[in-house]
Amino acid sequence: MLSSFLMLSIISSLLTICVIFLVRMLYIKYTQNIMSHKIWLLVLVSTLIPLIPFYKISNFTFSKDMMNRNVSDTTSSVSHMLDGQQSSVTKDLAINVNQFETSNITYMILLIWVFGSLLCLFYMIKAFRQIDVIKSSSLESSYLNERLKVCQSKMQFYKKHITISYSSNIDNPMVFGLVKSQIVLPTVVVETMNDKEIEYIILHELSHVKSHDLIFNQLYVVFKMIFWFNPALYISKTMMDNDCEKVCDRNVLKILNRHEHIRYGESILKCSILKSQHINNVAAQYLLGFNSNIKERVKYIALYDSMPKPNRNKRIVAYIVCSISLLIQAPLLSAHVQQDKYETNVSYKKLNQLAPYFKGFDGSFVLYNEREQAYSIYNEPESKQRYSPNSTYKIYLALMAFDQNLLSLNHTEQQWDKHQYPFKEWNQDQNLNSSMKYSVNWYYENLNKHLRQDEVKSYLDLIEYGNEEISGNENYWNESSLKISAIEQVNLLKNMKQHNMHFDNKAIEKVENSMTLKQKDTYKYVGKTGTGIVNHKEANGWFVGYVETKDNTYYFATHLKGEDNANGEKAQQISERILKEMELI
């Protein structure tokens, strides 16, 4: 999750920069004017897009399963004999899935991230100390106060808490303070430039204060401290500073007489030339911002009089286009596209009394009473958490195969290819019944190979199967990218039993019969186990099914998560104890 977020954050912000660059270029071309620098704040928003949860978005996924998992069908395997009427022939068979340990990598990434942020924080503290030095060394002047009043009058901006001073510890004009603003001019500027030139410089700094540019700059500083690894923030910050200076120049030029425009440009150029090479306030400048390309500014000032007035409608359209680009990419780049949690709110009866059955496991149990249309749930948060379906997915893979005529009602046989598998039950010809009873992987892998990926995606979307993510390896259902919650397992069984799916009713009945564990006069007991073995440890156990009585049907799903021994057999044992306690079997 962490690596996905960091990666998607960079991609999202880079895409946003590309869009802004394109829109900005077209805007300049067709309006002969500049856009507001505030458009670059969208880049900050884009870095947070991966944190936004979106439901049922699936086509574009950076799945950790794609990067971290490698399936082995020749490593260790586990066989569990299941309790029940057909225990002599029904086994919970599963093979191991090797996964690289991602926890250490995650911790390492987190450590590097925090270390980088701490370095940025240290640099920020250094900047604040430099600012304190500048403030303490700055001197007030009645002359500058008079110039400030003149400039405020010209700009019609009478902010109460604003002061002006000069300091020999800076080489270019600066503005401090988010609430109480302080303009500080370099001593060399005050000593060298004339009254008009100083007023031009003050007008420019006042424009920064009036536009609240320092606030936007501080936002960028905070984001750069947190997302220091993201090159998009450095690119966009440079562009924002350049545009910010031009916007402030434009604001000043608006209030000056036409014949003063050239003199204003000359003053800006002169102020830049007066910079000292011996003053080091880089840290403070990093915090305060507004570095710019002086050549671009002078060129803009020189061409200002020939530029048409800004078109407000076109500017609004440009902003809307950039904002829409964020909305479009948001669902595509959300780190939650895998949807490891099923987002739903259902009314249910709590089954807290079942806790002893799940001792030693993080587990959940979901029961749906068809007649009463009511859910009963143990551990509701866990029942919404999605996990690999493992062999429980074979139910729906079989239905897809029937729909694509890979299987028929009269012919479900597949010949064994003589490959030696870990279980003797797998080393023989199979049909639907035997493959379901013994969870024969190769049988369903063969079916899956004959299904196009887009077909599988369509089926999963049609029946609303979990996160619908099949971007992992070829066994995407076996501790890979495809995930589903216990509540969704129950809903799927209900829809299948009620024939509310696209599939043929007779095909559904054929699959149901292959899952039947017990048939009595008073009830029919149907179920399927699933076991996820990760690095030779049973970490994920499923048992899903239903009990059909004469006047009702009860759908259930039990899931177990643990360090080891969380398997389908254990899930079935717990399920049957619960169902017996409820007097359903």
From Swiss-Prot:
InterPro entries, alphabetized: Beta-lactam/transpept-like (IPR012338), Beta-lactam_resp_regulator (IPR052173), PCN-bd_Tpept (IPR001460), Peptidase_M56 (IPR008756)
Region named Beta-lactamase-like: 351-585
Alphabetic keyword roster: Antibiotic resistance
Keyword set includes Cell cycle: no
Superkingdom as given in the UniProt entry: Bacteria
Gene Ontology molecular function, alphabetical: penicillin binding
Record GO biological process: response to antibiotic
UniProt keyword Cell membrane, yes or no: no
Entry's transmembrane regions: none
Function statement: Penicillin-interactive protein and potential antirepressor.
Similarity comment text for this entry: Belongs to the peptidase M56 family.
PANTHER family in the cross-refs: POSSIBLE SENSOR-TRANSDUCER PROTEIN BLAR, SLR0241 PROTEIN
Protein name according to UniProt: Methicillin resistance mecR1 protein
Organism: Staphylococcus aureus (strain N315)
Primary gene name: mecR1
